[in-house]
């Protein structure tokens, strides 16, 4: 029963494909896509049977597919001597990994501590503190910019006052010099 519905679904898909290829007006000359595919397959089979190199190529493709299968390597049996050579070649690496694994196993009780288990509870607080920190950094930047502006204004004002005091000093010196130059009347 299921095979019949699969065939019907396949037939419906082929008919839809034919509508896409030939358009809504129907097939041209009552030629079906499936018929065309069968003809192409037969032609390829005829060509392949006549050429020896094509036959060899088909066999090599099958071998290639077999070798690319990940389970193929698992099926190949290595002699124990080869396995021993692999293990001896990687002895230092294996020993270093064992040492690291022992360190991890020694640290497992720390992972089960109440401090680590309380991390999710503190995550919300940490998030709030991070937001406050970001806001304070923004405020710090604003205050720094305002301070720079105030310092620039202070420097300008100090410069102007210095110039004004220098002008007043020069004027006062000129007035004092003029007063001393006048002949003293007796």
Swiss-Prot record:
Transmembrane stretches, start-end: none
Coiled coil: 135-157
Name the UniProt record assigns to this protein: Dynactin subunit 3
GO CC aspect terms: centrosome; cleavage furrow; cytoplasm; dynactin complex; kinetochore; midbody; spindle
Highest taxon of the lineage: Eukaryota
Chain's role: Part of the dynactin complex that activates the molecular motor dynein for ultra-processive transport along microtubules. Together with dynein may be involved in spindle assembly and cytokinesis.
Keyword Repressor set for record: no
Keyword flag Chloroplast: no
Residues bearing the modification N-acetylalanine: 2
Alphabetical UniProt keywords: Acetylation, Cell cycle, Cell division, Centromere, Chromosome, Coiled coil, Cytoplasm, Cytoskeleton, Kinetochore, Mitosis
Main location: cytoplasm
Subcellular location: Cytoplasm; Cytoplasm, Cytoskeleton, Microtubule organizing center, Centrosome; Chromosome, Centromere, Kinetochore; Cytoplasm, Cytoskeleton, Spindle
Pfam family, one: Dynactin_p22
GO biological process: cytoskeleton-dependent cytokinesis
């Amino acid at each position: 029963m299921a095979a019949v519905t699969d065939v019907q679904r396949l037939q419906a898909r082929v008919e839809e494909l034919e509508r896409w290829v030939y358009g809504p007006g129907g097939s041209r000359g009552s030629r079906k896509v499936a018929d065309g595919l069968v003809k192409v397959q037969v032609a390829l089979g005829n060509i392949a049977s006549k050429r020896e190199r094509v036959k060899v190529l088909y066999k090599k493709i099958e071998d290639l597919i077999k070798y690319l299968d990940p389970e193929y390597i698992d099926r190949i049996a290595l002699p124990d001597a080869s396995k021993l050579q692999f293990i001896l070649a990687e002895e230092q690496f294996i020993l270093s990994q064992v040492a690291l694994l022992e360190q991890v196993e020694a640290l497992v009780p720390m992972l089960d501590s109440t401090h680590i288990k309380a991390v999710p509870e503190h995550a919300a607080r940490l998030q709030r503190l991070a937001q406050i920190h970001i806001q304070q950094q923004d405020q710090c930047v604003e205050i720094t910019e305002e301070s720079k502006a105030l310092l620039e204004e202070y420097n300008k004002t100090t410069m102007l006052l210095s110039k004004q005091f220098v002008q007043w000093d020069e004027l006062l010196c000129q007035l004092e010099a003029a007063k001393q130059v006048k002949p003293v009347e007796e």
